[in-house]
Amino acid sequence: MSAVVKSIKAREILDSRGNPTVEADVVLSDGSFGRAAVPSGASTGSHEAVELRDGDKSRYNGLGVQKAVTNVNTAIAKAISGFKASDQQGLDNLLIELDGTPNKAKLGANAMLATSLAVAHAAAASCHMPLYRYLNNCDEYILPVPMFNILNGGKHASNSTDFQEFMVMPTGAKSFAEALRMGTEVYHSLKKVLKGMNQNTTVGDEGGFAPSLPTNKDAVEVILKAIEKAGYRPGEDIFIALDPASSELYQDGKYTLATENKTLSSAEMVDYWCGWVEKYPIISIEDGLFEDDWDGWKMLTKKIGSKVQLVGDDFYVTNIKRLERGIKENASNSILIKLNQIGTLSETIAAIKMANNSAWTAVVSHRSGETEDTTIADLAVAMNAGQIKTGAPCRAERTAKYNRLLRIEEELGGKAKYPGKEAFFNLK
Protein backbone atom coordinates (compact mmCIF):
# COMPACT_ATOMS: atom_id res chain seq x y z
CA MET A 1 0.00 0.00 0.00
CA SER A 2 1.28 3.48 -0.87
CA ALA A 3 2.24 5.70 2.03
CA VAL A 4 -0.03 8.65 2.77
CA VAL A 5 0.63 11.98 4.46
CA LYS A 6 0.36 11.56 8.21
CA SER A 7 1.47 15.01 9.34
CA ILE A 8 3.01 18.27 8.19
CA LYS A 9 4.65 20.89 10.37
CA ALA A 10 5.92 24.24 9.10
CA ARG A 11 8.15 26.75 10.86
CA GLU A 12 9.78 30.11 10.26
CA ILE A 13 13.55 29.79 9.64
CA LEU A 14 16.18 32.21 8.30
CA ASP A 15 17.49 32.42 4.75
CA SER A 16 21.04 33.41 3.78
CA ARG A 17 20.18 37.12 3.97
CA GLY A 18 18.89 36.80 7.51
CA ASN A 19 15.26 37.09 6.41
CA PRO A 20 12.55 34.67 7.50
CA THR A 21 11.38 31.92 5.17
CA VAL A 22 9.20 28.81 5.39
CA GLU A 23 10.43 25.30 6.14
CA ALA A 24 8.12 22.27 6.25
CA ASP A 25 8.52 18.75 7.65
CA VAL A 26 6.32 15.93 6.35
CA VAL A 27 5.89 12.50 7.94
CA LEU A 28 4.18 9.68 6.03
CA SER A 29 2.15 6.75 7.33
CA ASP A 30 5.17 4.43 6.94
CA GLY A 31 7.38 6.77 8.99
CA SER A 32 9.20 8.28 5.99
CA PHE A 33 10.30 11.87 6.50
CA GLY A 34 10.79 14.80 4.12
CA ARG A 35 11.93 18.37 4.74
CA ALA A 36 12.08 21.39 2.43
CA ALA A 37 12.86 25.09 2.83
CA VAL A 38 11.87 27.84 0.43
CA PRO A 39 14.21 30.49 -1.04
CA SER A 40 13.48 34.17 -1.74
CA GLY A 41 14.58 36.63 -4.45
CA ALA A 42 15.83 40.25 -4.28
CA SER A 43 15.09 41.26 -7.87
CA THR A 44 11.69 39.68 -8.43
CA GLY A 45 9.56 39.63 -11.55
CA SER A 46 6.20 41.38 -11.21
CA HIS A 47 4.46 38.30 -12.63
CA GLU A 48 5.78 35.91 -9.96
CA ALA A 49 3.51 33.93 -7.65
CA VAL A 50 2.96 35.74 -4.34
CA GLU A 51 5.40 35.21 -1.51
CA LEU A 52 3.24 35.74 1.57
CA ARG A 53 4.86 38.06 4.14
CA ASP A 54 3.26 39.23 7.38
CA GLY A 55 3.79 42.98 6.94
CA ASP A 56 4.02 43.36 10.74
CA LYS A 57 6.74 46.01 11.13
CA SER A 58 7.32 45.03 14.76
CA ARG A 59 8.69 41.62 13.67
CA TYR A 60 11.56 41.13 11.22
CA ASN A 61 10.85 44.55 9.64
CA GLY A 62 7.56 43.24 8.28
CA LEU A 63 9.20 40.27 6.52
CA GLY A 64 7.94 37.56 8.88
CA VAL A 65 6.22 34.51 7.37
CA GLN A 66 3.99 33.45 10.26
CA LYS A 67 0.86 33.73 8.09
CA ALA A 68 2.34 31.31 5.53
CA VAL A 69 3.46 28.96 8.33
CA THR A 70 -0.04 29.05 9.85
CA ASN A 71 -1.55 28.28 6.44
CA VAL A 72 0.59 25.14 6.22
CA ASN A 73 -0.14 24.06 9.78
CA THR A 74 -3.92 24.56 9.48
CA ALA A 75 -5.67 24.68 6.07
CA ILE A 76 -2.99 22.78 4.12
CA ALA A 77 -2.39 20.18 6.87
CA LYS A 78 -6.11 19.43 7.02
CA ALA A 79 -6.44 19.18 3.22
CA ILE A 80 -3.48 16.85 2.62
CA SER A 81 -3.86 14.55 5.62
CA GLY A 82 -4.28 11.00 4.29
CA PHE A 83 -3.29 12.05 0.76
CA LYS A 84 -1.23 9.55 -1.27
CA ALA A 85 2.33 10.93 -1.16
CA SER A 86 3.36 9.48 -4.52
CA ASP A 87 0.63 11.43 -6.36
CA GLN A 88 2.64 14.65 -6.71
CA GLN A 89 0.46 16.06 -9.49
CA GLY A 90 -2.71 15.36 -7.50
CA LEU A 91 -1.23 16.93 -4.38
CA ASP A 92 -0.14 20.07 -6.22
CA ASN A 93 -3.54 20.35 -7.94
CA LEU A 94 -5.16 20.11 -4.52
CA LEU A 95 -2.96 22.96 -3.22
CA ILE A 96 -3.77 25.12 -6.27
CA GLU A 97 -7.49 24.44 -5.79
CA LEU A 98 -7.29 25.17 -2.06
CA ASP A 99 -5.58 28.50 -2.78
CA GLY A 100 -8.05 29.42 -5.54
CA THR A 101 -6.23 32.54 -6.77
CA PRO A 102 -4.35 32.94 -10.07
CA ASN A 103 -1.11 33.96 -8.30
CA LYS A 104 -1.22 31.91 -5.07
CA ALA A 105 -1.96 35.02 -3.02
CA LYS A 106 -4.25 33.33 -0.48
CA LEU A 107 -2.04 30.55 0.89
CA GLY A 108 1.24 32.03 -0.39
CA ALA A 109 3.58 30.40 -2.92
CA ASN A 110 6.07 29.99 -0.05
CA ALA A 111 3.58 27.91 1.98
CA MET A 112 2.57 25.86 -1.06
CA LEU A 113 6.11 25.19 -2.28
CA ALA A 114 7.40 24.13 1.15
CA THR A 115 4.53 21.61 1.25
CA SER A 116 4.97 20.43 -2.34
CA LEU A 117 8.71 19.79 -1.95
CA ALA A 118 8.57 18.29 1.54
CA VAL A 119 6.00 15.73 0.34
CA ALA A 120 8.23 14.87 -2.65
CA HIS A 121 11.22 14.34 -0.34
CA ALA A 122 9.14 12.13 1.96
CA ALA A 123 7.78 10.11 -0.99
CA ALA A 124 11.34 9.59 -2.28
CA ALA A 125 12.41 8.39 1.19
CA SER A 126 9.42 6.04 1.26
CA CYS A 127 10.62 4.51 -2.04
CA HIS A 128 14.20 4.33 -0.69
CA MET A 129 15.39 6.48 -3.59
CA PRO A 130 17.35 9.72 -3.89
CA LEU A 131 15.04 12.54 -4.97
CA TYR A 132 16.45 12.80 -8.52
CA ARG A 133 15.74 9.11 -9.19
CA TYR A 134 12.30 9.29 -7.60
CA LEU A 135 11.39 12.21 -9.91
CA ASN A 136 12.75 10.48 -13.02
CA ASN A 137 13.98 6.89 -12.88
CA CYS A 138 16.16 6.50 -15.98
CA ASP A 139 19.34 4.71 -17.09
CA GLU A 140 21.53 7.74 -17.72
CA TYR A 141 21.50 11.25 -16.26
CA ILE A 142 22.93 14.53 -17.48
CA LEU A 143 24.79 16.51 -14.82
CA PRO A 144 24.38 20.28 -15.21
CA VAL A 145 26.99 22.73 -16.47
CA PRO A 146 27.25 25.26 -13.62
CA MET A 147 26.87 29.01 -14.07
CA PHE A 148 29.17 30.43 -11.39
CA ASN A 149 28.17 33.95 -10.41
CA ILE A 150 31.65 35.20 -9.54
CA LEU A 151 31.06 38.95 -9.81
CA ASN A 152 27.95 40.59 -8.35
CA GLY A 153 26.46 43.98 -9.09
CA GLY A 154 23.01 45.56 -9.36
CA LYS A 155 20.62 44.65 -6.56
CA HIS A 156 22.94 41.92 -5.22
CA ALA A 157 25.69 44.36 -4.23
CA SER A 158 26.13 48.05 -3.49
CA ASN A 159 28.58 50.47 -5.25
CA SER A 160 29.02 48.08 -8.12
CA THR A 161 28.11 47.60 -11.80
CA ASP A 162 24.67 48.22 -13.34
CA PHE A 163 24.40 44.56 -14.29
CA GLN A 164 23.57 42.06 -11.60
CA GLU A 165 25.57 38.94 -12.41
CA PHE A 166 28.72 38.11 -14.32
CA MET A 167 29.18 34.36 -14.52
CA VAL A 168 31.58 31.74 -15.87
CA MET A 169 30.58 28.39 -17.39
CA PRO A 170 33.24 25.64 -17.63
CA THR A 171 32.02 23.99 -20.83
CA GLY A 172 35.43 22.43 -21.48
CA ALA A 173 35.29 20.17 -18.41
CA LYS A 174 34.92 16.39 -18.77
CA SER A 175 32.86 15.93 -15.58
CA PHE A 176 30.88 17.98 -13.08
CA ALA A 177 33.68 17.57 -10.53
CA GLU A 178 36.18 19.03 -13.01
CA ALA A 179 33.78 21.87 -13.88
CA LEU A 180 33.47 22.71 -10.18
CA ARG A 181 37.25 22.75 -9.83
CA MET A 182 37.69 24.97 -12.90
CA GLY A 183 35.04 27.44 -11.75
CA THR A 184 36.52 27.56 -8.27
CA GLU A 185 40.04 28.16 -9.59
CA VAL A 186 38.77 31.07 -11.69
CA TYR A 187 36.94 32.42 -8.62
CA HIS A 188 40.16 32.43 -6.57
CA SER A 189 42.09 33.82 -9.53
CA LEU A 190 39.57 36.69 -9.75
CA LYS A 191 40.13 37.48 -6.09
CA LYS A 192 43.88 37.86 -6.75
CA VAL A 193 43.25 40.02 -9.84
CA LEU A 194 40.92 42.31 -7.86
CA LYS A 195 43.36 42.54 -4.94
CA GLY A 196 46.10 43.49 -7.40
CA MET A 197 43.87 46.38 -8.52
CA ASN A 198 43.32 47.44 -4.87
CA GLN A 199 39.69 46.47 -5.30
CA ASN A 200 37.28 45.36 -2.63
CA THR A 201 36.94 41.55 -2.37
CA THR A 202 33.93 41.39 -0.08
CA VAL A 203 31.20 39.15 -1.45
CA GLY A 204 27.59 39.83 -2.48
CA ASP A 205 24.44 37.84 -1.67
CA GLU A 206 25.39 34.97 -3.98
CA GLY A 207 29.05 34.70 -2.98
CA GLY A 208 30.49 36.61 -5.95
CA PHE A 209 32.84 39.54 -5.43
CA ALA A 210 31.31 43.01 -5.42
CA PRO A 211 34.08 45.44 -6.43
CA SER A 212 33.55 49.12 -7.27
CA LEU A 213 34.34 48.97 -10.97
CA PRO A 214 33.96 52.08 -13.15
CA THR A 215 31.99 50.40 -15.96
CA ASN A 216 30.20 47.17 -16.81
CA LYS A 217 32.87 46.33 -19.40
CA ASP A 218 35.53 46.41 -16.67
CA ALA A 219 33.72 43.52 -14.99
CA VAL A 220 34.03 41.36 -18.12
CA GLU A 221 37.67 42.39 -18.62
CA VAL A 222 38.70 41.39 -15.08
CA ILE A 223 36.92 38.04 -15.46
CA LEU A 224 38.72 37.34 -18.76
CA LYS A 225 42.01 38.13 -17.03
CA ALA A 226 41.09 35.81 -14.14
CA ILE A 227 40.22 32.95 -16.55
CA GLU A 228 43.61 33.30 -18.28
CA LYS A 229 45.54 33.60 -15.01
CA ALA A 230 43.88 30.37 -13.83
CA GLY A 231 45.33 28.68 -16.93
CA TYR A 232 42.15 28.45 -19.03
CA ARG A 233 41.16 29.76 -22.45
CA PRO A 234 38.16 32.11 -22.56
CA GLY A 235 35.75 31.04 -25.30
CA GLU A 236 37.10 27.49 -25.35
CA ASP A 237 37.43 26.04 -21.83
CA ILE A 238 35.24 28.62 -20.17
CA PHE A 239 32.52 30.96 -21.46
CA ILE A 240 30.95 34.02 -19.90
CA ALA A 241 27.25 34.23 -18.98
CA LEU A 242 25.45 37.42 -17.95
CA ASP A 243 22.36 38.33 -15.99
CA PRO A 244 21.96 42.10 -16.25
CA ALA A 245 18.48 41.90 -14.62
CA SER A 246 17.38 44.59 -17.09
CA SER A 247 13.93 45.07 -15.53
CA GLU A 248 15.80 46.83 -12.71
CA LEU A 249 17.34 49.24 -15.26
CA TYR A 250 14.09 50.06 -17.07
CA GLN A 251 12.07 53.19 -16.42
CA ASP A 252 9.65 55.15 -18.60
CA GLY A 253 10.43 53.11 -21.71
CA LYS A 254 14.21 53.52 -21.42
CA TYR A 255 17.17 51.54 -20.04
CA THR A 256 19.47 53.54 -17.76
CA LEU A 257 23.09 52.40 -17.42
CA ALA A 258 24.20 54.70 -14.60
CA THR A 259 27.89 53.68 -14.58
CA GLU A 260 28.13 54.44 -18.31
CA ASN A 261 25.96 57.56 -18.15
CA LYS A 262 23.73 56.13 -20.90
CA THR A 263 19.99 56.03 -21.47
CA LEU A 264 19.05 53.58 -24.20
CA SER A 265 15.89 52.74 -26.11
CA SER A 266 14.84 49.12 -26.58
CA ALA A 267 16.46 48.93 -30.05
CA GLU A 268 19.65 50.54 -28.71
CA MET A 269 19.78 48.03 -25.84
CA VAL A 270 19.50 45.20 -28.39
CA ASP A 271 22.42 46.72 -30.35
CA TYR A 272 24.36 47.12 -27.09
CA TRP A 273 24.12 43.35 -26.48
CA CYS A 274 24.98 42.55 -30.10
CA GLY A 275 28.16 44.61 -29.64
CA TRP A 276 29.11 42.75 -26.45
CA VAL A 277 28.53 39.35 -28.06
CA GLU A 278 30.83 40.33 -30.96
CA LYS A 279 33.54 41.46 -28.57
CA TYR A 280 33.44 38.92 -25.72
CA PRO A 281 33.06 35.10 -25.41
CA ILE A 282 29.49 35.36 -24.11
CA ILE A 283 27.36 32.22 -24.40
CA SER A 284 24.31 33.22 -22.36
CA ILE A 285 22.40 36.43 -21.52
CA GLU A 286 19.56 36.28 -19.01
CA ASP A 287 16.97 39.06 -18.81
CA GLY A 288 18.83 41.22 -21.32
CA LEU A 289 15.64 43.28 -21.62
CA PHE A 290 12.71 44.44 -19.46
CA GLU A 291 10.19 41.72 -18.48
CA ASP A 292 7.40 43.19 -20.64
CA ASP A 293 9.49 44.43 -23.58
CA TRP A 294 8.21 41.69 -25.90
CA ASP A 295 9.23 43.53 -29.07
CA GLY A 296 12.76 44.04 -27.75
CA TRP A 297 13.09 40.37 -26.82
CA LYS A 298 11.94 39.27 -30.28
CA MET A 299 14.39 41.67 -31.90
CA LEU A 300 17.28 40.39 -29.76
CA THR A 301 16.39 36.75 -30.51
CA LYS A 302 16.21 37.47 -34.22
CA LYS A 303 19.65 39.09 -34.17
CA ILE A 304 21.70 36.79 -31.91
CA GLY A 305 19.39 33.93 -30.83
CA SER A 306 21.18 31.41 -33.04
CA LYS A 307 24.55 31.89 -31.32
CA VAL A 308 23.72 33.01 -27.76
CA GLN A 309 21.42 31.48 -25.16
CA LEU A 310 18.79 34.13 -24.31
CA VAL A 311 17.25 33.22 -20.98
CA GLY A 312 13.96 34.59 -19.68
CA ASP A 313 13.77 34.89 -15.89
CA ASP A 314 11.61 37.88 -14.84
CA PHE A 315 10.31 37.58 -18.42
CA TYR A 316 8.72 34.14 -17.89
CA VAL A 317 8.78 33.68 -14.08
CA THR A 318 8.59 29.87 -14.60
CA ASN A 319 5.01 30.42 -15.73
CA ILE A 320 3.65 28.12 -18.46
CA LYS A 321 1.28 30.74 -19.89
CA ARG A 322 4.07 33.29 -20.37
CA LEU A 323 6.43 30.59 -21.64
CA GLU A 324 3.83 29.42 -24.15
CA ARG A 325 3.59 32.94 -25.55
CA GLY A 326 7.40 33.23 -25.67
CA ILE A 327 7.68 30.01 -27.66
CA LYS A 328 4.89 31.02 -30.03
CA GLU A 329 6.39 34.46 -30.67
CA ASN A 330 10.02 33.25 -30.75
CA ALA A 331 10.84 35.75 -28.01
CA SER A 332 13.91 33.90 -26.67
CA ASN A 333 15.40 30.40 -26.67
CA SER A 334 15.69 29.50 -22.99
CA ILE A 335 13.89 29.77 -19.66
CA LEU A 336 15.23 30.14 -16.13
CA ILE A 337 13.53 27.75 -13.74
CA LYS A 338 12.88 28.93 -10.17
CA LEU A 339 10.63 26.78 -8.02
CA ASN A 340 9.35 29.64 -5.89
CA GLN A 341 8.32 31.77 -8.88
CA ILE A 342 5.49 29.34 -9.57
CA GLY A 343 5.01 27.61 -6.20
CA THR A 344 4.65 23.86 -6.87
CA LEU A 345 6.96 21.09 -8.06
CA SER A 346 4.53 19.83 -10.74
CA GLU A 347 4.17 23.23 -12.40
CA THR A 348 7.96 23.64 -12.36
CA ILE A 349 8.47 20.27 -14.05
CA ALA A 350 5.76 21.13 -16.61
CA ALA A 351 7.63 24.34 -17.52
CA ILE A 352 10.91 22.43 -18.04
CA LYS A 353 9.16 19.85 -20.22
CA MET A 354 7.42 22.51 -22.29
CA ALA A 355 10.75 24.27 -22.92
CA ASN A 356 12.51 21.04 -23.88
CA ASN A 357 9.68 19.96 -26.19
CA SER A 358 10.17 23.20 -28.10
CA ALA A 359 13.96 22.69 -28.36
CA TRP A 360 14.57 25.37 -25.74
CA THR A 361 17.06 25.04 -22.91
CA ALA A 362 15.99 25.26 -19.26
CA VAL A 363 18.37 26.54 -16.57
CA VAL A 364 17.50 25.41 -13.02
CA SER A 365 18.19 28.24 -10.59
CA HIS A 366 18.56 29.25 -6.95
CA ARG A 367 17.45 32.62 -5.54
CA SER A 368 19.65 35.27 -3.95
CA GLY A 369 18.08 34.52 -0.54
CA GLU A 370 18.82 30.79 -0.18
CA THR A 371 18.84 28.08 2.47
CA GLU A 372 20.81 24.87 2.93
CA ASP A 373 18.05 23.02 1.00
CA THR A 374 19.53 21.19 -2.03
CA THR A 375 16.33 20.25 -3.92
CA ILE A 376 17.37 22.18 -7.05
CA ALA A 377 20.49 20.01 -7.47
CA ASP A 378 18.31 16.88 -7.62
CA LEU A 379 15.77 18.64 -9.86
CA ALA A 380 18.46 19.66 -12.39
CA VAL A 381 19.69 16.05 -12.60
CA ALA A 382 16.21 14.48 -12.62
CA MET A 383 15.08 16.65 -15.52
CA ASN A 384 18.40 16.34 -17.40
CA ALA A 385 18.28 20.14 -17.58
CA GLY A 386 21.97 20.41 -18.46
CA GLN A 387 22.52 23.72 -16.67
CA ILE A 388 22.30 25.00 -13.10
CA LYS A 389 22.73 28.46 -11.67
CA THR A 390 23.46 28.44 -7.97
CA GLY A 391 25.93 31.20 -7.17
CA ALA A 392 29.66 31.38 -6.55
CA PRO A 393 31.64 28.45 -5.11
CA CYS A 394 31.46 30.30 -1.79
CA ARG A 395 28.95 30.59 1.10
CA ALA A 396 27.49 27.38 2.46
CA GLU A 397 23.99 27.87 1.03
CA ARG A 398 25.58 27.91 -2.47
CA THR A 399 28.22 25.19 -2.00
CA ALA A 400 25.55 22.89 -0.50
CA LYS A 401 24.07 22.55 -4.01
CA TYR A 402 27.46 22.01 -5.67
CA ASN A 403 28.44 19.43 -3.07
CA ARG A 404 25.13 17.62 -3.56
CA LEU A 405 25.87 17.45 -7.31
CA LEU A 406 29.35 16.03 -6.60
CA ARG A 407 27.78 13.26 -4.53
CA ILE A 408 25.14 12.54 -7.18
CA GLU A 409 27.83 12.29 -9.89
CA GLU A 410 29.87 9.93 -7.71
CA GLU A 411 26.78 7.80 -6.95
CA LEU A 412 25.88 7.53 -10.64
CA GLY A 413 29.39 6.65 -11.81
CA GLY A 414 29.31 5.74 -15.51
CA LYS A 415 25.61 6.62 -15.70
CA ALA A 416 26.40 10.32 -15.29
CA LYS A 417 27.18 12.43 -18.35
CA TYR A 418 28.59 15.95 -18.26
CA PRO A 419 27.35 17.71 -21.41
CA GLY A 420 29.86 20.56 -21.72
CA LYS A 421 29.00 22.70 -24.73
CA GLU A 422 26.27 20.22 -25.74
CA ALA A 423 24.17 21.81 -22.98
CA PHE A 424 23.59 24.56 -25.56
CA PHE A 425 22.06 22.12 -28.03
CA ASN A 426 19.95 24.79 -29.75
CA LEU A 427 22.82 27.13 -30.67
CA LYS A 428 24.70 26.98 -33.96
From Swiss-Prot:
Molecular functions (GO terms): magnesium ion binding; phosphopyruvate hydratase activity
The family database entries (PANTHER family) matched by this protein are listed as: ENOLASE (PTHR11902:SF1)
Obligatory cofactor(s): Mg(2+)
Entry's localization field: Cytoplasm; Secreted; Cell surface
User: HAMAP family from the xrefs?
Assistant: Enolase
Q: Which organism is it from?
A: Dehalococcoides mccartyi (strain ATCC BAA-2266 / KCTC 15142 / 195)
Family the entry assigns: Belongs to the enolase family.
Q: Does the keyword Cytoplasm apply?
A: yes
InterPro entries assigned to the protein according to its UniProt record, in alphabetical order = Enolase (IPR000941), Enolase-like_C_sf (IPR036849), Enolase-like_N (IPR029017), Enolase_C (IPR020810), Enolase_CS (IPR020809), Enolase_N (IPR020811)
Q: Which keywords appear in this protein's UniProt record, sorted alphabetically?
A: Cytoplasm, Glycolysis, Lyase, Magnesium, Metal-binding, Secreted
Q: Where does Mg(2+) bind?
A: 243, 286, 313
Which residues are involved in binding (2R)-2-phosphoglycerate?
164, 338, 367-368, 389
CDD domains listed in its UniProt record: enolase
Q: What is its main location?
A: cytoplasm
This protein's pathway reads: Carbohydrate degradation; glycolysis; pyruvate from D-glyceraldehyde 3-phosphate: step 4/5
User: Mind telling me what this protein is named?
Assistant: Enolase
What remark does the entry make about the cofactor?
Binds a second Mg(2+) ion via substrate during catalysis.
A GO term (biological process) for this protein?
Answer: glycolytic process
